[in-house]
Amino acid sequence: MRNVRGTTAASQRMGTLGQRPDRTASHRRLITDGGVDESDDEGDADDAESDDAGREEMAAVPIGVKLGSTRTVVSLPDSRGAGDEIIRTLTCLATYEDALTGEERVLYGEEAASEYPDRVQFLLRSGLPEDEDRAALCEKFFSTLIEENDLPAYSAVVYAIPTIDNPAGIENLKSVIEGSDIGGRLVESYPESLCGAIPAFGDDLEAIDEIFLAVNMGSTNLEASAYRRGEQLAPFTTGAVTGNEVDRMIANNVEEETQGRVNIDEQTAREYKETHADFDAFEPFTDVIQQPGGGSHEFTIERSVMDACEDYLDEAVEEVANTFLPELANDHMKVYQLALDRPVVLTGGMACIPGIVDEFEERLGAALQRDVEVITADQPDLAPTIGAKRIAERLVDDD
């Protein structure tokens, strides 16, 4: 059985990636080489040896995966092997009955959300599968995604996992990973914020040799951790400051700004945020809704989106400056001092908002009364998956 371990509130350490990983370290390889069970049948043994020999000649495909609460992202080599092929979809599914055969059919991602809004299910609203039923649905979603995108079974897969102290949820995620048809060579998991920091530091794995702070601005949690040469220290998580809460605030703000004439759902609010939020140059925008009984109503949004984003950023800075950093200083004073002299990395979907990096830098510096530098990858929402794929590439090379 595959031994899949997620990140919890305990410290995680990955081996030095320039060397073969230490399998006794606290963060270890999660699956051994893709072999078969022993059998007394000589024919089966011969087939297994032939299989293994064939696999030795075939290079395992490195794959990075992030099963996110809003979106799932997969990164693998493109057809030329020179860049990344990115598969990005909403982490949701809907089932329906085939009109001809009566069989159950599955739609996932944007297609499910748009065609079956009344029955679509987002599977990881808390960041992990909440129970066995949700894990089974998540497994169905993931297997459908794998099949439709023809992801290779003989692959080395690294999962970017959120830092959540939820053993039951980690076990449910383990069942999803174990049930998938990829990862025949190896499967491993690393903290999402570490994976997301890798593209921010350069084109290789420079982040693994750094001491730095990472803040993951996700849909369901705000996470912060220190990293010392790949070792995760003082992981902090709160569900009080989230991208999902921003969506709810935008929906409420729109109702208030339009004096109750317009009500939008959270999906529409998220689209407003992703399309229009901008700390550098926000511009008011108009939208149109159909009114009951016929006719339409055009309205303009001036404050609703950015008021919610401003509140989010203030709360995120407060959590980092007044909760996470004091805890880090108390437990690891030297790392605290060294890390603040190095860049703070923002990851996660909220880090995609234009101008948020500079605003976070200014507000965190003011809160700490010192200069800080804040950076992010070019595409913060894709960065954890790209970083995970780079780790997978190194692990394959080291084997």
Where are these regions (language model features)?
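Phosphate-binding glycine-rich/basic clefts of nucleotide- and phosphate-handling proteins
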Residues: T95-Y96, G102-E104, R228-E318, N322-A329, ...
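Conserved phosphate-binding catalytic cores of ATP/NTP-utilizing and phosphoryl-transfer enzymes
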Residues: D33-M58, V187-V215, T385-E393
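Conserved phosphate-binding loops in N-terminal lobes of ATP-dependent enzymes
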Residues: T16, D22, E56-V61, L67-G169, ...
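Gly/Thr-rich phosphate-binding beta-strand-loop-beta motif of the actin/hexokinase/Hsp70
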Residues: R55-G83, L205-Q232
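Short, aromatic/basic amphipathic alpha-helical patches
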Residues: I170-S180, V357-G365
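Small-residue (GG/TT-enriched) beta-loop-alpha framework at ligand/catalytic clefts
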Residues: G179-N263
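Helical "lid/coupling" subdomains associated with nucleotide-phosphate turnover
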Residues: L128-L137, E188, C195, P199, ...
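Haloarchaeal acidic low-complexity proteome signature biased toward cell-envelope/secretome components but also
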Residues: M1-M58
